[in-house]
Amino acid sequence: PAGITTAIAAAREGMNSVILERSEHIGGLPVNGLGATDIATRGATTGLFGEFVALNREYYRQKYGDKSAQFRDCSDGYHFEPSVAAITFETMIRRTGPGKIEVLLLRQFDAQPKYVIKKGEKITSIRVLNRATGLEEYYTGKMFVDATYEGDLGAAAGVPYKLGREGAGEYGEPCAGKIYRWWKHGPDAEGTTYQGDNAVQAYNYRLCLTNNPLNRRDIPKPDNYTRAELVSLIDDV
């Protein structure tokens, strides 16, 4: 969603944008299963995120009514179905006006320096793969925003970066580094070192769950699935 809101903000300032998305739909985590925002200070909600939340709320109010369980459960728009988030983002893009934002799906950027064309330290164009046609495409712009979770464009362009987490002493942060904590309260648990390491945040699936058999969808087993490679994860769970 960072790329979407960046394009919307630019459109409101009179600029045109192209959103290049690797998958078949835009929206990031909110459109792929993360249907509940966990912001604790809702009074701080403003800007484009505030508009996103308000549109979610209005969707449930109009579709189900303000006395409905669905409207109540949407928690003023902070809780939403992924399909509703997709509708909201599409609405926000459409409201910028014709031609302001072009969305191109199935465009893959491969994180290699040769696919970034620069003039000095400034990116002038990038090469992407059209996954639908298998053809290379080049896009030129005055500014490029890497709004992905991985930051591959920045890395390929030579922007310095660091992997891992800092130790507590590096920047004077008492909650940094390797820490094991008891739930809610208590002293730091055994194994705590406060030291940094090269660990990165785990990837996982954000799935929508249901107890309604009519809403269930089977997950097909991938052709390359090998149970032995994953069975050790059971102990972690």
Which role fits each region the language model picked out?
Residues 6, 29, 155-157:
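Short glycine-/acidic-enriched loop or helix-start segments at secondary-structure transitions
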Residues 12-31:
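Glycine-rich FAD pyrophosphate-binding loop
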Residues 39-237:
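Aromatic-residue-lined binding/catalytic grooves and analogous aromatic/hydrophobic interfacial grooves
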